[in-house]
């Protein structure tokens, strides 16, 4: 009986330590204090087949994951296959600029615009003036939205 009680005490102490470790690892940061940027692009598939769109987005996702600092990168297609939403998240404006430089100068720029037309481009988070200038100089029409509440948990 003493062994069972001792084992239960050790188990419970271990569970408490795990909870404390999780609490210590995850930090909550107000959105307004975060440098993260989230890109939301609403894309038209320009009458390309859903199969061609999916093949290209899978290829591009594999290409990006090997080269980019984005922490989120995903394509989502509508039921009719005519619209795609692209969501990207970057640690800061500089990472977003680097992505833009790599995209514009990379091997997939022309193919992207053969497959897609950008209908709406929204940036969530605090974008620096340097980021805004870069996107403007490169012809991107962007709707910027800054945080008015919320948090990021890391």
Predicted regions and their residues:
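Sec-dependent N-terminal signal peptides
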Residues: 4-12
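A short gly/proline-enriched turn/hairpin at secondary-structure junctions
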Residues: 87-88, 111
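Short S/T/G/P-rich N-terminal loop/turn motif that feeds into the first structured element of a domain
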Residues: 15-84, 91-101, 115-154
């Amino acid at each position: 009986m003493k062994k069972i009680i001792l084992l239960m005490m050790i188990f419970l102490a271990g569970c408490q330590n795990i909870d404390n470790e999780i609490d210590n690892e995850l930090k909550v940061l107000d959105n307004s204090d975060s440098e993260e940027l989230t890109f939301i692009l609403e894309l038209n598939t320009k009458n390309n087949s859903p199969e061609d769109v999916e093949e290209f987005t899978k290829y591009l996702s594999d290409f990006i994951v090997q080269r980019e600092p984005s922490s989120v990168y995903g394509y989502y297609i509508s039921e009719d296959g005519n619209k795609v939403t692209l969501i990207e998240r970057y640690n800061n404006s500089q990472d977003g600029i680097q992505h833009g430089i790599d995209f514009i100068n990379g091997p997939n720029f022309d193919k992207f615009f053969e497959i897609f037309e950008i209908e709406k481009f929204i940036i969530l988070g605090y974008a620096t003036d340097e980021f805004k200038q870069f996107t403007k100089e490169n012809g991107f029409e962007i709707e910027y939205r800054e945080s008015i509440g919320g948090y990021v948990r890391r």
